[in-house]
Amino acid sequence: MPRHKKIAVFFILLLATGLIGMNIYDNQQKKKQEAQEQRQTTTLEKTAIDRTEGDKERANDFTLKTTSGETIRLSDYRGKKVILNFWATWCPPCKAEMPHMQAFHEKHKNDVEIIAVNLTSLDNGNDALEKFIKDYRLTFTIPLDQEGTIGNRYKAYTIPTSYVIDEEGYIQHKVIGPMNEEMMEDMVTSNG
């Protein structure tokens, strides 16, 4: 075999070995990262849920200021069902969900409270928020999570994330992703 063919075969084998090695290394790194994320998720102590009374899960109380400057506490809404929603103005699924949420609010504002927590720490500023509220004609309560602590506590890592909370403050449902009006109707009428 001529010398230049031997060199070509050598480089092809070297390249193939390198590609196989890189693929194995990438797979190992992905597995390590997934394992680390799983450990982090399971070691989170402070969550949205205070476990009491068997398998009922009480929603963790919080205090936030609304867009109008009013201070609200989640526990102030005991005695009424609550849809607790986490969202941001730049989020396309949140944008799709808001007209449904507003329509639901207009029909059920006496029976169900919508608290749509804006993840302000991740959002595009107050001007964008004010424009969004005006454009979508939102009239339900919108508190501001300036630090991101409430969103983290409720594990709103994917938005929108919503919780349906019963009159006694217990979580009935958690929904990751957008809801339509029919889904909201179904969830507030079911008992968990």
Protein language model regions, located:
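Sec-exported extracytoplasmic/periplasmic mature domains
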Residues: 96, 103-110, 134-137, 141, ...
